[in-house]
Protein backbone atom coordinates (compact mmCIF):
# COMPACT_ATOMS: atom_id res chain seq x y z
CA UNK A 1 0.00 0.00 0.00
CA UNK A 2 1.50 3.33 -1.07
CA UNK A 3 1.97 6.03 1.54
CA UNK A 4 2.68 9.75 1.38
CA UNK A 5 4.42 12.21 3.64
CA UNK A 6 2.61 15.45 4.47
CA UNK A 7 4.78 17.17 1.87
CA UNK A 8 3.88 14.58 -0.81
CA UNK A 9 0.16 14.90 -0.06
CA UNK A 10 0.36 18.70 -0.18
CA UNK A 11 1.98 18.56 -3.62
CA UNK A 12 -0.58 16.09 -4.99
CA UNK A 13 -3.49 18.18 -3.71
CA UNK A 14 -1.82 21.54 -4.43
CA UNK A 15 -2.51 22.77 -0.90
CA UNK A 16 -0.38 23.83 2.05
CA UNK A 17 0.99 21.36 4.59
CA UNK A 18 -1.24 23.06 7.19
CA UNK A 19 -4.28 22.26 5.03
CA UNK A 20 -3.16 18.62 4.86
CA UNK A 21 -3.15 18.65 8.67
CA UNK A 22 -6.72 19.95 8.69
CA UNK A 23 -7.82 17.26 6.23
CA UNK A 24 -6.26 14.63 8.50
CA UNK A 25 -8.00 16.02 11.58
CA UNK A 26 -11.39 15.94 9.78
CA UNK A 27 -10.84 12.40 8.52
CA UNK A 28 -11.07 13.52 4.89
CA UNK A 29 -7.72 11.86 4.26
CA UNK A 30 -6.28 9.03 6.35
CA UNK A 31 -2.94 8.65 8.05
CA UNK A 32 -1.06 7.35 11.08
CA UNK A 33 1.33 9.20 13.37
CA UNK A 34 4.87 7.78 13.55
CA UNK A 35 6.75 9.76 16.15
CA UNK A 36 6.30 13.37 15.10
CA UNK A 37 5.60 12.57 11.45
CA UNK A 38 2.51 11.48 9.54
CA UNK A 39 2.34 8.50 7.18
CA UNK A 40 -0.61 9.25 4.90
CA UNK A 41 -2.61 6.71 2.92
CA UNK A 42 -2.15 7.60 -0.75
CA UNK A 43 -5.49 6.08 -1.78
CA UNK A 44 -7.36 8.41 0.57
CA UNK A 45 -5.50 11.39 -0.90
CA UNK A 46 -6.50 10.38 -4.43
CA UNK A 47 -10.11 9.76 -3.29
CA UNK A 48 -10.24 13.24 -1.77
CA UNK A 49 -8.72 14.75 -4.91
CA UNK A 50 -11.40 13.12 -7.07
CA UNK A 51 -14.30 14.62 -5.10
CA UNK A 52 -13.05 18.04 -4.09
CA UNK A 53 -14.30 21.14 -5.86
CA UNK A 54 -12.11 22.76 -8.46
CA UNK A 55 -13.26 26.21 -7.45
CA UNK A 56 -15.28 27.66 -4.61
CA UNK A 57 -16.15 25.83 -1.44
CA UNK A 58 -18.37 22.87 -0.61
CA UNK A 59 -21.70 23.69 0.99
CA UNK A 60 -21.85 24.01 4.76
CA UNK A 61 -23.66 21.07 6.42
CA UNK A 62 -27.19 22.52 6.65
CA UNK A 63 -27.25 23.63 3.03
CA UNK A 64 -25.51 20.44 1.92
CA UNK A 65 -28.30 18.30 3.35
CA UNK A 66 -31.00 20.55 1.89
CA UNK A 67 -29.44 20.48 -1.58
CA UNK A 68 -28.79 16.74 -1.40
CA UNK A 69 -32.30 15.74 -0.37
CA UNK A 70 -33.90 18.09 -2.91
CA UNK A 71 -31.66 17.08 -5.81
CA UNK A 72 -32.72 15.45 -9.07
CA UNK A 73 -29.74 13.36 -10.18
CA UNK A 74 -29.99 11.67 -13.58
CA UNK A 75 -26.38 10.81 -14.47
CA UNK A 76 -23.16 9.74 -12.78
CA UNK A 77 -21.69 13.13 -13.65
CA UNK A 78 -24.54 14.75 -11.71
CA UNK A 79 -23.83 12.42 -8.79
CA UNK A 80 -20.12 13.26 -8.80
CA UNK A 81 -20.82 17.00 -8.79
CA UNK A 82 -23.29 16.57 -5.94
CA UNK A 83 -20.78 14.51 -3.94
CA UNK A 84 -18.30 17.37 -4.28
CA UNK A 85 -20.71 20.10 -3.25
CA UNK A 86 -22.18 18.14 -0.32
CA UNK A 87 -19.01 16.56 1.03
CA UNK A 88 -19.13 18.46 4.33
CA UNK A 89 -22.56 17.25 5.39
CA UNK A 90 -20.81 14.93 7.88
CA UNK A 91 -17.39 14.19 9.35
CA UNK A 92 -16.03 10.95 7.91
CA UNK A 93 -14.26 8.33 10.05
CA UNK A 94 -12.71 5.27 8.44
CA UNK A 95 -12.63 2.71 11.27
CA UNK A 96 -12.02 -0.93 12.05
CA UNK A 97 -14.75 -2.97 13.72
CA UNK A 98 -14.24 -6.59 14.75
CA UNK A 99 -16.09 -8.57 12.03
CA UNK A 100 -18.17 -10.42 14.61
CA UNK A 101 -19.67 -7.10 15.72
CA UNK A 102 -20.73 -5.91 12.26
CA UNK A 103 -24.23 -7.43 12.34
CA UNK A 104 -24.93 -5.86 15.74
CA UNK A 105 -23.65 -2.52 14.49
CA UNK A 106 -25.91 -2.70 11.43
CA UNK A 107 -28.92 -3.38 13.68
CA UNK A 108 -28.09 -0.71 16.28
CA UNK A 109 -30.93 1.82 16.45
CA UNK A 110 -28.44 4.68 16.80
CA UNK A 111 -27.05 4.20 13.29
CA UNK A 112 -28.57 4.98 9.90
CA UNK A 113 -27.23 2.75 7.13
CA UNK A 114 -26.00 4.08 3.80
CA UNK A 115 -23.97 2.72 0.89
CA UNK A 116 -24.75 -0.77 -0.35
CA UNK A 117 -26.90 -1.56 2.72
CA UNK A 118 -29.27 1.26 1.81
CA UNK A 119 -29.06 0.28 -1.84
CA UNK A 120 -30.17 -3.28 -1.06
CA UNK A 121 -32.99 -2.01 1.16
CA UNK A 122 -34.42 -0.06 -1.78
CA UNK A 123 -33.95 -2.85 -4.35
CA UNK A 124 -30.75 -1.70 -6.07
CA UNK A 125 -28.78 -4.60 -7.59
CA UNK A 126 -25.74 -4.22 -5.34
CA UNK A 127 -23.62 -6.75 -3.50
CA UNK A 128 -23.14 -6.39 0.25
CA UNK A 129 -19.50 -6.06 1.19
CA UNK A 130 -17.05 -3.90 3.08
CA UNK A 131 -16.92 -1.20 4.00
CA UNK A 132 -20.22 -0.82 5.85
CA UNK A 133 -21.28 2.82 5.41
CA UNK A 134 -23.43 4.51 8.03
CA UNK A 135 -24.36 7.74 9.78
CA UNK A 136 -24.40 8.51 13.50
CA UNK A 137 -25.57 11.65 15.27
CA UNK A 138 -22.87 13.47 17.20
CA UNK A 139 -24.74 12.87 20.48
CA UNK A 140 -24.44 9.09 20.00
CA UNK A 141 -21.00 8.83 18.46
CA UNK A 142 -19.03 8.36 21.69
CA UNK A 143 -21.16 5.40 22.79
CA UNK A 144 -21.15 3.83 19.32
CA UNK A 145 -17.38 4.13 19.08
CA UNK A 146 -16.89 2.71 22.57
CA UNK A 147 -19.11 -0.29 21.84
CA UNK A 148 -17.92 -1.20 18.35
CA UNK A 149 -14.80 0.59 17.11
CA UNK A 150 -11.40 -0.98 17.69
CA UNK A 151 -9.39 1.57 15.69
CA UNK A 152 -10.16 4.97 14.13
CA UNK A 153 -8.67 6.74 11.07
CA UNK A 154 -7.29 3.55 9.53
CA UNK A 155 -6.10 3.16 5.95
CA UNK A 156 -8.13 -0.03 5.35
CA UNK A 157 -11.48 0.60 7.09
CA UNK A 158 -14.22 -2.00 7.15
CA UNK A 159 -16.72 0.63 8.35
CA UNK A 160 -17.22 4.26 7.32
CA UNK A 161 -18.90 6.25 10.09
CA UNK A 162 -20.23 9.68 9.08
CA UNK A 163 -20.93 11.90 12.07
CA UNK A 164 -23.75 14.44 11.72
CA UNK A 165 -24.50 17.39 14.01
CA UNK A 166 -27.94 18.31 12.65
CA UNK A 167 -31.22 16.49 13.30
CA UNK A 168 -31.54 15.37 9.68
CA UNK A 169 -31.14 11.68 10.57
CA UNK A 170 -34.43 11.72 12.48
CA UNK A 171 -36.37 11.70 9.21
CA UNK A 172 -34.79 8.43 8.06
CA UNK A 173 -35.93 4.99 9.26
CA UNK A 174 -32.59 3.22 9.74
CA UNK A 175 -31.59 3.62 6.06
CA UNK A 176 -30.79 6.82 4.18
CA UNK A 177 -32.64 7.54 0.91
CA UNK A 178 -31.05 6.29 -2.29
CA UNK A 179 -29.75 9.75 -3.21
CA UNK A 180 -27.64 9.83 -0.04
CA UNK A 181 -26.41 6.28 -0.58
CA UNK A 182 -25.50 7.26 -4.14
CA UNK A 183 -23.28 10.19 -3.20
CA UNK A 184 -21.65 8.19 -0.40
CA UNK A 185 -20.76 5.41 -2.83
CA UNK A 186 -19.38 7.97 -5.28
CA UNK A 187 -17.34 9.59 -2.51
CA UNK A 188 -15.83 6.20 -1.64
CA UNK A 189 -15.03 5.47 -5.29
CA UNK A 190 -17.45 2.52 -5.56
CA UNK A 191 -18.77 3.56 -8.97
CA UNK A 192 -20.07 0.10 -9.83
CA UNK A 193 -22.47 0.06 -6.89
CA UNK A 194 -23.25 3.75 -7.43
CA UNK A 195 -24.42 3.02 -10.99
CA UNK A 196 -26.77 0.32 -9.70
CA UNK A 197 -28.19 2.71 -7.11
CA UNK A 198 -28.65 5.35 -9.80
CA UNK A 199 -30.51 2.80 -11.95
CA UNK A 200 -32.80 1.99 -9.02
CA UNK A 201 -33.66 5.68 -8.69
CA UNK A 202 -34.95 5.97 -12.27
Describe the role of every protein-language-model region.
Residues 1-23:
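Polyanion-binding surface elements
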Residues 3-4, 26, 30-52:
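Short helix-start
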Residues 45-78:
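A short, Lys/Arg-enriched interface patch at domain edges and termini
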Residues 48, 67-70, 85, 89, ...:
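Residues that form generic nucleotide/phosphate-binding pockets
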Residues 71-93:
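Long, leucine/valine-rich, helix-dominated scaffolding and oligomerization segments
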Residues 95-202:
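Phosphate-handling catalytic interfaces
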Amino acid sequence: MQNFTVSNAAKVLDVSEAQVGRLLSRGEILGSKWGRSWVIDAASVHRYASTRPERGRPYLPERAWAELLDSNVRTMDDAKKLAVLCRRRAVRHGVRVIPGFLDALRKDSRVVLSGVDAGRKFKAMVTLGPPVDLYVHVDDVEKVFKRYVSEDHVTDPNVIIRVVESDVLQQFEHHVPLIVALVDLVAEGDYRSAKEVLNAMK
